[in-house]
Amino acid sequence: MSDSMSYAVLVAATLFLGIGLQIAWLFFSNFIKRKRLESRISEVSIAIGKNAKNPENEAYVLNYLKEKFSPERFENRITDALGLIISVIHIPLSLLITVWYFAMIAGRIFGFMNIEPVVLWVPMILQLLLSIAIFIFSVFIKIVFGRYPGEANGFNKEFIKTIK
């Protein structure tokens, strides 16, 4: 197999694996969101002493959540700030990793960046490590503060939309 053919195969493999990893992470994220929602419903039911899924208890649920996610609470301000920091770091880093990956492919094709083909796996690994690090950090914040980064802000935005 020629050098350019093996490079093309490696590019295709990293692209398919990268897309596969993103799809798998999306499914994992949706699974985690469902688990968080179930956990939140259980928490609210215990806190108000009534079934949170029952529409008759909507006012109790809403009052509990408004109090829990109130912008005046210190832990909400901290976790919202941490959520913003995560976004400010994650989005540019993900974009840089993606640009770097495609720049390596273009550099090899057009001859201005002579890299070993195996180096194409590095951006994929970095992207996966970044996602895992953010997930672990978010779980740590949940353990310390009782809510995920940006969760209070997200609730308050949705609550304001519902009122309007």
UniProtKB/Swiss-Prot annotation:
The chain crosses the membrane at residues 8-28, 85-105, 121-141. Keywords: Host cell inner membrane, Host cell membrane, Host membrane, Membrane, Transmembrane, Transmembrane helix. The keyword Cytoplasm does not apply. It is found in: Host cell inner membrane. It is a multi-pass membrane protein. One of its GO terms (cellular component) is host cell membrane. The keyword Oxidoreductase does not apply. Probably blocks the subsequent transfer of the phage DNA across the inner membrane into the cytoplasm. By this means, P22 excludes superinfection by the phages of the same family and also against DNA coming from oter phages. This is Superinfection exclusion protein A. It comes from Salmonella phage P22.
